Amino acid sequence: ICLALPLPGDEVQQNWTHFVRIGAYGLSPTNANAITVDARASNVFGIEVDNDIPGRYESFLEPTEKLAAIRRVAQKTHEAGNKAFVYIAGTECITANADKAAHSVVKDHPDWLQRKITGEPAVFTGGAAFWIREGDEDVWISPYATPWRKIYMERVRQIAATGIDGIYVDIPYWMTHFDGWEDTWASFDDFTVAAFRASTGLDARNDLKLGNFTDPSFRKWIDFRIATFTDFMREIRENARKVNPSIMVIPEIYPGIEQEAVRVGADVYELYAVVDAIAHEY
């Protein structure tokens, strides 16, 4: 019997995302060391930190303070022999106290917003979801909003450059999961409609029988919506790895194979090829 054994230098390093025991922490400018100490004490390997840059309008515009905090936690984590990854939103963006603020996404960039076919924008206030506080503005942005996407990918590169081990992208979806939006098959904003026309020659506002899976044009809309977020996640990883070749990109996708995958436009079977791991929330 002949056994082929690997030589000492031939070991393949296992992907750390495959065997982590994670803990989640809110990251501030001053608590990086405390996070690392607590993670060690509780046998955490794989520290998730909440310090969302693109999903909060203030830091989307000015990320310096949060980037410094991410850099500190990455350094402390590595000194302890651990790994850390940071949460960012997909297409959602919240402006704190928008009812009193001079600037918000809606006030500054209403054309960026996802929309129903009726034109209603994806804008929500306190009570629409548990994480949206009274006075805050919560919006969902079209991934085809070119100026937004350019800044978003710049923020991804800046985050990756901190040395953090991973980026956790929360639900990169079309807005079809809040009350009143489930059957909209959004988005019908100008950016998205133009991209669909360029891809298929069809007018999304007039050529589709929404919800009718026997309609060939609607099926093209379904495929287009899924391809959109597959390409979005691919671009996130490409941008992150330009500055940090070993960084991991991990989207959170709660649908599996059920109908919600088609509605929100995130198909895990398409995404596996363009990300490093997928987090499921059930």
Question: Model regions: which residues?
Answer:
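Aromatic-lined substrate-binding rim segments of carbohydrate-active enzymes
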Residues: 50-90, 94-95, 104-105, 240
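Alpha-helical scaffolding within the catalytic cores
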Residues: 29-36, 70, 258-269
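Hydrophobic faces of well-ordered beta-strands that scaffold small-molecule active sites
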Residues: 18-24, 47-49, 84-87, 167-169, ...
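Polysaccharide-binding and catalytic clefts of secreted carbohydrate-active enzymes
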Residues: 118-282
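Active-site mouth loops of central-metabolism enzymes
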Residues: 16-32, 137-151
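Acidic (Asp/Glu)-rich catalytic clusters
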Residues: 35-43, 72-81, 268-273
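Active-site beta-loop-alpha junctions enriched in small/polar residues
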Residues: 25-27, 52-54, 89-91, 172-174, ...
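Catalytic domains of carbohydrate-active enzymes, especially glycoside hydrolases
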Residues: 27-56, 159-166
